[in-house]
Amino acid sequence: MSSLSLVEQAKKSAAYQAVDENFPVSAKVVGIGSGSTVVYVAERIGQLANKDSFVCIPTGFQSKQLIIDNGLKLGAIEQFPEIDIAFDGADEVDPALNLIKGGGACLFQEKLVAASAKTFVVVADYRKKSDNLGIQWKQGVPIEIVPNSYAKVIQDLKKLGAITVNLRQGGSAKAGPIITDNNNFLLDADFGAIKDPKALHDQIKALVGVVETGLFTSMAAKSYFGEQDGQVNIWSI
């Protein structure tokens, strides 16, 4: 078996175990995020016998498609602001279950769903584990901002200690900056190793023009990792 298929099997095992151990029997509203491991979360939830008894809230386009593809009932957070449990991936996780999220440009909706959930469970592969945020994930903290504030916010982030700040671009498919689902811009600010994610989040969030940061602190209850050797590793508070 190749190392890739071992990791892929571990991701599937981690996702299935996360659902089996945490999904409430009486759940009525379920948040489903995005990421390569969450694909298996949606698959497992789609196998539940009572899947017609709850609705699923997406965090973005990919998760909306996962919900539909697995025959699950699609809902909107505007209709269901109280979520029983949410599952999502992460770009980086530290031992205190602080997260960096937003590499896929959906951080606001991801944080809204996580904050609305009674229980928030992370599923990811071993590459997302880190002793400190900002070590494994080199691209920086994703920050959603109001478009006309970008020049000012970039200046302010550098005053807070950011080594580099980049306005995220759309790549070959789009000339110019990425536009989020909320019609905002995204910055990626590299602060190096982040010793106090909560304090940094608070400082960034206080800046005029900032809508939300990709620092998720004191939100996740558990994180399930698919390991390189095919095993599942669980971190919890």
Swiss-Prot record:
Organism: Scheffersomyces stipitis (strain ATCC 58785 / CBS 6054 / NBRC 10063 / NRRL Y-11545) (Yeast)
Keywords noted in UniProt: Cytoplasm, Isomerase
Protein name: Ribose-5-phosphate isomerase
A single GO BP: pentose-phosphate shunt, non-oxidative branch
Catalytic reactions of this protein: aldehydo-D-ribose 5-phosphate = D-ribulose 5-phosphate
The enzyme's E.C. designation: 5.3.1.6
One MF annotation (Gene Ontology) recorded for this entry: ribose-5-phosphate isomerase activity
Organismal lineage: Eukaryota, Fungi, Dikarya, Ascomycota, Saccharomycotina
Name of the gene encoding the protein in the UniProt record: RKI1
Similarity remark: Belongs to the ribose 5-phosphate isomerase family.
Pathway of action: Carbohydrate degradation; pentose phosphate pathway; D-ribose 5-phosphate from D-ribulose 5-phosphate (non-oxidative stage): step 1/1
